[in-house]
UniProtKB/Swiss-Prot annotation:
One of its GO terms (biological process) is DNA catabolic process. It is found in: Cytoplasm. It comes from the Bacteria. NCBIfam families: xseA. One of its GO terms (molecular function) is exodeoxyribonuclease VII activity. This is Exodeoxyribonuclease 7 large subunit. Keywords: Cytoplasm, Exonuclease, Hydrolase, Nuclease. Heterooligomer composed of large and small subunits. PANTHER family: EXODEOXYRIBONUCLEASE 7 LARGE SUBUNIT. Belongs to the XseA family. Disulfide bonds: none annotated. It holds the Pfam family Exonuc_VII_L.
Length: 446
């Protein structure tokens, strides 16, 4: 009689086979991403082709190492192991590595990041800075031992020997290179003596140049206060640093030429040209002046110089005559006014009028004093009457004379009709207060 297996037994047996099969421990598989929805950590989706579908799992650690984003419909080449899930008997592939089919992972990562940064405006022309025409000090972020810095020094020294170069020694490839490039760009921007910044390295593979495609480097160049020239790789190489930089140079030599657009020779030629222009302008000015002198020397004014001031002399004579006439008329009018005033003063008895005013002032003073005294006495008497009335209403004075004050609920009780049997009253006396309860109320007319 045949032995029957339980479903669990069969599933465990199959899982054991899966786990021990060397061909299933490392599987190379090609398929199209399906049912993908990005999750915060682990990723779960399907890989399919025309004839079949397999479930796929990528743990968070493996997904972070991808370098590009998975997308629905993307065709992948993956490496992983096959695993059987016992509860439902399904199998799936645990993906350890993946790259796009037909295109390198770095190329895809480059394109995805380029589109993202372009959408955020990092490469817009409106953010580009103009390069200065004259520089005194140039910063260079590159390797201290490569040909890049030698080419830059040689070119700038040849074109404009007075320009200083400040090197920021930088790791330009490998782990940590992007962070070092970004940090040195930030350091350069902290200096006040730099006019320009060159960021670059020599040629290499896409992996060698990858530090200049990292978002941290793009961000540092974008935020740079100093204008930035990018010179990464050869002429055919293009990095994201080239897109965001203010200018891109195909070679280090070209970068140095962009940094010094005007050479020492250009300045010497310009100075010579300006000297020649100044010399020619001086000659023209001297010739024109000589022509004017010659013209004036033959004029009537130079041959008869007294004619230059004849008109001014005549005008001075007229003004002198007019001034003397005006002065005499003004003096005559002043004398007449003086005589009139003397006549008026003589007709007025000033002393008598002054005495009358003094008498009137003394009388007014006496009346004012008397009036003020009467008002003061009247006001004082009124005040004393009001004070006496107020003192007569002072309860403390009344109580001091032997009377008592009756209060109900804190208020003065003045009438029997306001009090009823059982009320609690306070009797305020000269030396204290009594608390009493009313036992009976008798209303009597007094």
């Amino acid at each position: 009689m045949a032995d029957y297996l339980s479903v669990t037994q069969l599933t465990k047996y199959l899982k054991l086979k899966f786990d021990r099969d060397p061909y299933l421990e490392r599987v190379y598989l090609t398929g199209q991403v399906s049912n993908f929805r990005k999750r915060p950590n682990h990723q779960y989706f399907s890989l399919k082709d025309e004839g079949a579908v397999i479930q796929a799992t990528m743990w968070a650690g493996a997904y972070k190492k991808l370098g590009f984003d998975l997308e629905e419909g993307m065709k992948l080449n993956v490496v992983g192991r096959i695993q059987l899930y016992e509860p439902n008997g399904s199998y799936s592939i645990i993906i350890e590595k993946a790259e796009p089919d037909g295109i390198g992972a770095l190329a895809l990562q480059f394109e995805q990041l380029r589109q993202k940064l372009a959408g955020e405006g990092f490469f817009d022309e409106r953010h580009k800075q103009a390069l200065p025409q004259f520089v005194t000090k140039v910063g260079v972020v590159t390797s201290p031992s490569g040909a890049v810095i030698r080419d830059i020094i040689t070119t700038i020294s040849r074109r404009f020997p007075g320009v200083s170069i400040l090197l920021f020694p930088t790791k330009v490839q490998g782990e940590g290179a992007a962070q070092e490039v970004a940090a040195n760009i930030a350091r350069a921007n902290q200096r006040e003596d730099l006019d320009l910044l060159i960021v670059g390295r020599g040629g290499g593979s896409i992996e060698d140049l990858w530090a200049f495609n990292e978002e941290i480097v793009v961000q540092a160049i974008f935020e740079s206060r100093l204008p930035v020239i990018s010179s990464v790789g050869h002429e055919t190489d293009t990095t994201l640093a080239d897109f965001v930089a203010d200018r891109r140079a195909a070679t280090p030599t070209a970068a140095a030429e962009l940094a010094t657009p005007i050479t020492k020779t250009d300045i010497v030629s310009w100075i010579a040209e300006q000297q020649n222009r100044s010399y020619q302008a001086c000659l023209r000015y001297i010739r024109q002046g000589q022509e004017r002198v010659d013209k004036l020397s033959y004029s009537v004014m130079f041959r008869q110089p007294e004619r230059l001031y004849d008109a001014y002399s005549q005008r001075l004579d007229r003004l002198t005559t007019s001034l003397m006439t005006t002065f005499k008329e003004t003096l005559s009018e002043a004398k007449q006014e003086h005589l009139i005033l003397e006549h008026r003063l003589a007709s007025v008895n000033v002393q008598a009028r002054l005495e009358r005013y003094q008498d009137r002032l003394a009388t007014a003073h006496r009346l004012l004093i008397a009036n003020m005294t009467n008002q003061y006495d009247s006001k004082l008497a009124g005040f004393e009457r009001a004070q006496a009335a107020l003192l007569s209403l002072d309860t403390s004075r009344i109580i001091a004379r032997g009377y008592a004050l009756l209060k109900k609920d804190g208020a003065v009780a003045a009438c029997v009709k306001d009090i009823k049997k059982g009320d609690h009253l306070s009797i305020v006396m000269r030396d204290g207060q009594l608390e009493v309860e009313v036992e009976d109320v008798n209303e009597k007319n007094i």
